[in-house]
Amino acid sequence: SVGFKAGVKEYKLTYYTPEYQTKDTDILAAFRVTPQPGVPPEEAGAAVAAESSTGTWTTVWTDGLTSLDRYKGRCYRIERVVGEKDQYIAYVAYPLDLFEEGSVTNMFTSIVGNVFGFKALRALRLEDLRVPTAYIKTFQGPPHGIQVERDKLNKYGRPLLGCTIKPKLGLSAKNYGRAVYECLRGGLDFTKDDENVNSQPFMRWRDRFLFCAEALFKAQTETGEIKGHYLNATAGTCEEMMKRAIFARELGVPIVMHDYLTGGFTANTSLAHYCRDNGLLLHIHRAMHAVIDRQKNHGMHFRVLAKALRMSGGDHIHAGTVVGKLEGERDITLGFVDLLRDDFVEQDRSRGIYFTQDWVSLPGVLPVASGGIHVWHMPALTEIFGDDSVLQFGGGTLGHPWGNAPGAVANRVALEACVKPRNEGRDLAREGNEIIREACKWSPELAAACEVWKEIVFNFAAVDVLDK
């Protein structure tokens, strides 16, 4: 009979559907699945589809009160990962009606919620998501985007330069503001609060905001260029975060900052909406990302977190460097950098992109390269990231032997020295060091910086590598 039959049945009988034709409105996910010994890959893939959509561990009679066929996730393809023992890529399609409009929070609660603790799997990693255009149109996305930011700043044809103020913790507000002034006066476009600078006993947020605003307006007046300092509005409550953003707007500064993973997607989306409505740019730091994305077989790849940020909203986001001290393999990094900036990105497994992604009219996000970079890296960074990026030197500015302002001068000279020959068709990858040495002849600040950092390398193999 067709009636309700209690008991446990295999997931694959309901949720593994290799004949399924995906729809344009489906959210598609690529999971790296490592099943427990004895669990067939089809059952593991179907279990992921079930537990992240309508399924549970046993048959329930209330299944009969809805149309499971309409709402269930479906594992529609499974591929073995070459060169890895017992690893598979399981492709899952989710009907769009499973998700609340305009909510990254709800999307992740479903797709990467309970399923990651599932016992039948040894490990599970979400490698990529295809977000359909119908769902993307329910998001505001970045407050302003790349072109609007360039127009606000009146800066074109080159990457933007930033610097994280160090030591990251312990400075008083006035000394902090002084460092901001010196860096901006020396030629940088932005300075930055470190991600863990919120409102601590040694420097309360309001004092920092006031001294940083004074510093950037003074530097602006003296250089004739528009300057910014990423004022970190991240706080313990959403209300406090909004209070800080409102105060920044009242000071007339151009940009605020948020730690979007520790702060949470709900808070981030609220802040992004406020920033668009009030003309503030929004810089996003990815603190905590490596907890989620560092392991190759478990967690979630950063390209998914990057896509989620573009939907939730941010004008800049940290994206690794390829050449500095933090993780970032070149092809993979450029894959998600394109996902942040471009309107349309083709599927390309050689860059880790599992699905073609159409962003329709959602503005782009500027990738920020930061972490252990200095003047010798400038040719490579200019070559790899191109104009639409922010190159952020913390120690690579403030560690200059002559002080902060000369450190900023060295970075600006190195950047201008790389952009000009690149525009003339010279090969920065091959001639980069020679170009920097040439520029040292007419910039003593750059020459001093080159001398200090000539031996520094971070030679470690990347953890995040492509499958064979």
UniProtKB/Swiss-Prot annotation:
Source taxon at top rank: Eukaryota
Names of required cofactors: Mg(2+)
Family matches, as SUPFAM superfamilies: RuBisCo, C-terminal domain, RuBisCO, large subunit, small (N-terminal) domain
Active site: K166 (proton acceptor), H285 (proton acceptor)
Residue numbers bearing the N6-carboxylysine modification: K192
Reaction equation(s) it catalyzes: 2 (2R)-3-phosphoglycerate + 2 H(+) = D-ribulose 1,5-bisphosphate + CO2 + H2O; D-ribulose 1,5-bisphosphate + O2 = 2-phosphoglycolate + (2R)-3-phosphoglycerate + 2 H(+)
Post-translational modification (record): The disulfide bond which can form in the large chain dimeric partners within the hexadecamer appears to be associated with oxidative stress and protein turnover.
EC number: 4.1.1.39
Manner of cofactor binding, per the entry note: Binds 1 Mg(2+) ion per subunit.
InterPro entries: RuBisCO, RuBisCo_large_chain_AS, RuBisCO_lsu_C, RuBisCO_lsu_C_sf, RuBisCO_lsu_fd_N, RuBisCO_lsu_N_sf, RuBisCO_lsuI
Modified residues annotated as N6,N6,N6-trimethyllysine in this record: K5
Keyword DNA-binding listed: no
Note: The basic functional RuBisCO is composed of a large chain homodimer in a 'head-to-tail' conformation. In form I RuBisCO this homodimer is arranged in a barrel-like tetramer with the small subunits forming a tetrameric 'cap' on each end of the 'barrel'.
Record's subunit section: Heterohexadecamer of 8 large chains and 8 small chains; disulfide-linked. The disulfide link is formed within the large subunit homodimers.
Protein name: Ribulose bisphosphate carboxylase large chain
Organism of origin: Capsicum baccatum
